[in-house]
């Protein structure tokens, strides 16, 4: 029973608690579909997602690793002859900059239901 509780506790830990620095990498693109590839970050880097905007155009996005001191900054980037204002949003944890998926939501729901089944029923 104790082993079961320990396993559930480990599964319930947020992804950022494992200390692994793997992130999704995606070149600057005007497509919101950024499947990307996996990359390993340095010890002083965090995962990031960059969102760029320019007047009269659609947004651009990129993902990867970034020095933690550069997180949250806004910088100009050029894409297809247009200069965008790119703002980076950083996160910590393994692959934290990937797009949320229905599998993540389903896993959280399954974990909650599993915990509920392990608890003894209350007597009224």
From Swiss-Prot:
PANTHER family: SPERM ACROSOME MEMBRANE-ASSOCIATED PROTEIN 4 (PTHR47613:SF1). Testis specific. Expressed in spermatozoa. GO terms for cellular component: extracellular region; inner acrosomal membrane; membrane; outer acrosomal membrane; plasma membrane; side of membrane. A lipid is attached at residue 97 (GPI-anchor amidated asparagine). Gene3D superfamilies: CD59. GO terms for biological process: binding of sperm to zona pellucida; cell adhesion; fertilization; sperm-egg recognition. The keyword Phosphoprotein does not apply. Sperm surface membrane protein that is essential for effective sperm-zona pellucida binding and penetration during fertilization. Keywords: Cell adhesion, Cell membrane, Cytoplasmic vesicle, Disulfide bond, Glycoprotein, GPI-anchor, Lipoprotein, Membrane, Signal. CDD domains: TFP_LU_ECD_SPACA4. Transmembrane segments: none annotated. SUPFAM superfamilies: Snake toxin-like. Belongs to the SPACA4/bouncer family. It is found in: Cell membrane; Cytoplasmic vesicle, Secretory vesicle, Acrosome; Cytoplasmic vesicle, Secretory vesicle, Acrosome inner membrane; Cytoplasmic vesicle, Secretory vesicle, Acrosome outer membrane. This is Sperm acrosome membrane-associated protein 4. Its main location: membrane. It is a lipid-anchor; GPI-anchor. Disulfide bonds join 23-47, 26-34, 41-65, 71-90, 91-96. Residues 23-97 form the UPAR/Ly6 domain. Residues 98-124 form a propeptide. Residues 1-19 form the signal peptide.
């Amino acid at each position: 029973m104790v082993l079961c509780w320990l396993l559930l506790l480990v599964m319930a830990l947020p992804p950022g608690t494992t200390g692994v620095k793997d992130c999704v990498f995606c070149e600057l693109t005007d497509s919101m579909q950024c499947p990307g590839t996996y990359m390993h970050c340095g010890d002083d880097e965090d995962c990031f997602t960059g969102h760029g905007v320019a007047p009269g155009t659609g947004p651009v996005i990129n993902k990867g690793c970034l020095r933690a001191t550069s997180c949250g900054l806004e910088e100009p980037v050029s894409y297809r002859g247009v200069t965008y204002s790119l703002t980076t949003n950083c996160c910590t944890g393994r692959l934290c900059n990937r797009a949320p998926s229905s599998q993540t939501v389903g896993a959280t729901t399954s974990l909650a239901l599993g915990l509920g089944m392990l608890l003894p029923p209350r007597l009224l």
